[in-house]
Amino acid sequence: MAKLTKRMRNIREKVDVVKQYEINEAVALLKELATAKFVESVDVAVNLGIDARKSDQNVRGATVLPHGTGRSVRVAVFAQGANAEAAKEAGAELVGMDDLAAKVKAGEMDFDVVIASPDAMRVVGQLGQILGPRGLMPNPKVGTVTPNVAEAVKNAKAGQVRYRNDKNGIIHTTIGKVDFNEAQLKENLEALLVALKKAKPSSAKGVYIKKVSLSTTMGAGVAIDQASLSATV
């Protein structure tokens, strides 16, 4: 049997796996246990009351967190003409059409988000096998295929998170860093949950948000008492 590290022993001693923690208590505990030599991300897992096997119950979308994610995001935009100029002015690092597609095909992908104007999809469509497996393929459902590329760039830079349930009906995303304060992480989590509730499939029955858990990059997960969140959630 593998020997537990000091960090893992500390986590086991301090985290009650059956308890639902009040949000501020949970954040304080995660901060205490985040001992990695880098600033860890705070991640959330939301178990949804959906049947992920049914396409009409899948949940997918995007929302801008009020305090961002703490990450620096590099944006690539497929657009031409006025849209290309607007994307550059909004702060996109890479803007182009066939020239940008050539870079992607050559493996030059120094970006985190890809946005496209609708008229650019004839070019982007050729890149599906490259961008798709990396989760980078633009999609109108998450606002990355849009005629308003400037707004999409600003949203990406402002801390927009994209979400999609996995095969078990669980949403995984990031809501910030451990150096955010308790209020910032709480408000980011609440903003995400509000967005998820708005995206609830009409065919989903019973309890929709079944469980909410927070964890850090290298830490254990703690379950959140949803009653400790804002009444608007």
From Swiss-Prot:
HAMAP family: Ribosomal_uL1_B. One of its GO terms (molecular function) is structural constituent of ribosome. It comes from the Bacteria. Keywords: Repressor, Ribonucleoprotein, Ribosomal protein, RNA-binding, rRNA-binding, Translation regulation, tRNA-binding. Disulfide bonds: none annotated. Belongs to the universal ribosomal protein uL1 family. Gene3D superfamilies: 3.30.190.20, 3.40.50.790. One of its GO terms (biological process) is regulation of translation. This is Large ribosomal subunit protein uL1. NCBIfam families: rplA_bact. GO terms for cellular component: cytosolic large ribosomal subunit. Pfam families: Ribosomal_L1 (PF00687). Part of the 50S ribosomal subunit. The keyword rRNA-binding applies. Binds directly to 23S rRNA. The L1 stalk is quite mobile in the ribosome, and is involved in E site tRNA release. The keyword Ribosomal protein applies.
